[in-house]
């Protein structure tokens, strides 16, 4: 549906689709995986009634910052992507978009995001600098550490902190439970993603948790998902959430079980489907959160 909505952009200019691909608007899974935990937190921070202004700011901010993250990622990987089957057609790798054009795109996206943050409060503005720093750092970590997914987890969890400060003007200690839960969840699902490229990454020297975990990959991913659910349950207790929130967690748990079963042979396509499937887990938790507040 999302891709259908943006298809008309290809007719605006002969090169428009190249930029759509650069910022991955044609692959919205990253938007969803960033959006759901941000919205969990926005709803919890606002006791179920977030300000419309903040809702719009965070939805647009998620789209813009995920796009910016894709640009800096492709810049960092431009000399590697051509050697990986899944990424060899990316616009920077093929030369359809120049490095200069990529940097201009990145700057515009960050500037627009910052303009949105300026509509919140000082604490959230200060936090936004950390968001840009972590998002920019992640792509380069793949050269130096087997834990780039942890950095990605921090980047994908930063919106949780900002949602609380935007709604409450402060950051309660319990918000860190949501932050840590999302970091662990991100490491889990991005490890599935890294499993699809593991053989290519080994050849070109790119590091990932999928390589680090080796034959224990599915066991460790399952353990991370279990810890994610435990931390979310603890957060639910701290924020006095009820039955529907925990039903959302139960659906997410079922999603995680399906992912473990479907990747039992470690087929790269199955691992990629498991990665995509996490969107449904995040959506289930969000719907459970919304229902819990709405039906009180």
UniProtKB/Swiss-Prot annotation:
Pathway: Cofactor biosynthesis; ubiquinone biosynthesis. Its cofactor is Mg(2+). Pfam families: UbiA. The chain crosses the membrane at residues 29-49, 55-75, 102-122, 146-166, 169-189, 219-239, 241-261, 275-295. One of its GO terms (biological process) is ubiquinone biosynthetic process. The keyword Magnesium applies. Keywords: Cell inner membrane, Cell membrane, Magnesium, Membrane, Transferase, Transmembrane, Transmembrane helix, Ubiquinone biosynthesis. It catalyses: all-trans-octaprenyl diphosphate + 4-hydroxybenzoate = 4-hydroxy-3-(all-trans-octaprenyl)benzoate + diphosphate. GO terms for cellular component: plasma membrane. GO terms for molecular function: 4-hydroxybenzoate polyprenyltransferase activity. NCBIfam families: ubiA_proteo. This is 4-hydroxybenzoate octaprenyltransferase. It comes from Pseudomonas aeruginosa (strain UCBPP-PA14).
